[in-house]
Swiss-Prot record:
Binds 1 zinc ion per subunit. This is Glycerol-1-phosphate dehydrogenase [NAD(P)+]. Coiled coil: none annotated. One of its GO terms (cellular component) is cytoplasm. It comes from Methanosarcina barkeri (strain Fusaro / DSM 804). It catalyses: sn-glycerol 1-phosphate + NAD(+) = dihydroxyacetone phosphate + NADH + H(+); sn-glycerol 1-phosphate + NADP(+) = dihydroxyacetone phosphate + NADPH + H(+).
């Protein structure tokens, strides 16, 4: 039998080479750098709060390991801040970057390192979303939140002692981001059937598995428990791997994420990304004809928001976000199709008890 090879089917997948999850693993950052042959000048990208939580420790540990460490403090995930990080990296002749934070700093390090063609290490201080290990970065450009393609971290060092000490709201938001995989994969399957879009069964299965684990363990995810932090971090890393395998954010981002991004634009005070995605998943699962009650119950058990009131967002903004969600990424086909009308948007929000 003759084997025919399609040369155009090759795909480049970037995955983290070292992933450390556990109590006190931050102390091993020097060993990770040696293992990955990373030496010379490191640039630590962090915020003022996360610098006190872990940034200064990372700097001291790197210097003890024979690396010099410079630091740049950031405040927002904007295009201008990416340029600021890049300028600092060039100024100090950086060999690699380290993002230390709950999301913003990691995304900035991710984008800056990608553009500079330098490796970067992800050191999350909270487990609030799957950006800690993915090849995607959320950035604000001209006042609009966008998802940009970048490189995956060469290593992830997730110290559960630090992560479990963060406000539990962040961990609960991370659970919402993971559970949203369910509707993301359903949207992906729909696009494959109706628009002949590429569908990766392996990436989809990995994504679904992460969501299923969180739902089945919802009762045991508690504040200040390192076992809870470890469980959520591993699922978030799985999300990042699934996206890298797929070559897009499809396994972990669908209509529920478009709803969240619409809320970011519309609501005066948006909630956390993962919180909004969790609520969006309840409604999008209803539209898919799936078990939205299971999603809602799991989020409630964890302590994540399931209503507009719990998000701190007025009902009218929920409806408006539902009406505009399909236009956030018009090239990405989802259950929202060409959009909901006002009556349908209100109906889904009321039936799923997101609004009263």
């Amino acid at each position: 039998m003759k084997l025919t090879i399609n040369k155009n089917s090759a795909k480049w997948m970037q995955l983290p080479r070292d992933v450390l999850v556990g109590h006190g693993v931050l102390e091993e950052i020097g060993d990770v750098c040696r293992d990955l042959k990373m030496k010379g000048n490191a640039l630590i990208v962090t915020g003022s709060t996360t610098n006190n939580i872990a940034g200064k420790r990372v700097s001291n540990l790197l210097e003890s390991a024979g690396c010099s460490a410079e630091m740049v403090l950031t405040c927002k995930a904007t295009k201008e801040e990416v340029e600021k990080v890049m300028e600092k990296a060039l100024e100090v002749e950086t060999n690699f970057l380290i993002g230390v934070g709950s999301g913003r700093s990691i995304d900035l390090a991710k984008l800056a390192s990608t553009r500079l063609e330098l490796p970067f290490i992800s050191v999350p201080t909270a487990a609030s979303h799957d950006g800690i290990a993915s090849s995607r970065a959320s950035i604000v450009d001209n006042g609009r939140s966008t998802s940009a393609q970048a490189q995956a971290p060469i290593a992830v060092i997730a110290d559960t002692e630090i992560i479990s000490a963060a406000p539990f709201r962040f961990l609960a938001a991370g659970c919402g981001d993971i559970i949203s995989n369910y509707t993301a994969v359903l949207d992906w399957e729909l696009a494959s059937r109706l628009r002949n879009e590429y569908f990766g069964a392996y990436a989809a299965a990995l994504s679904r598995m992460a969501a299923r684990v969180i739902i089945e363990c919802a009762d045991s995810i508690k504040p200040e428990h390192e076992t809870s932090a470890r469980l959520v971090v591993k699922a978030l890393v799985s999300n990042g791997v699934a996206m890298s395998i797929a070559g897009s954010s499809r396994p972990a981002s669908g209509s529920e994420h478009m709803f969240s991004h619409a809320l970011d634009k519309i609501a005066p005070k948006p909630a956390l990304h993962g919180e909004q995605c969790g609520v969006g998943t309840i409604m999008m699962m209803y539209l898919h004809g799936g078990n939205w009650q299971e999603i809602r119950e799991a989020l409630k058990k964890i302590g994540a928001p399931v209503t507009a009131e719990e998000l701190g967002i007025e009902d009218r903004y929920i409806i408006e976000a539902l009406l505009h969600a399909h236009s956030i990424r018009p090239e990405r086909y989802t259950i929202l199709g060409s959009g909901l009308n006002p009556s349908a948007a209100e109906k889904v929000a009321r039936i799923t008890k997101v609004i009263n």
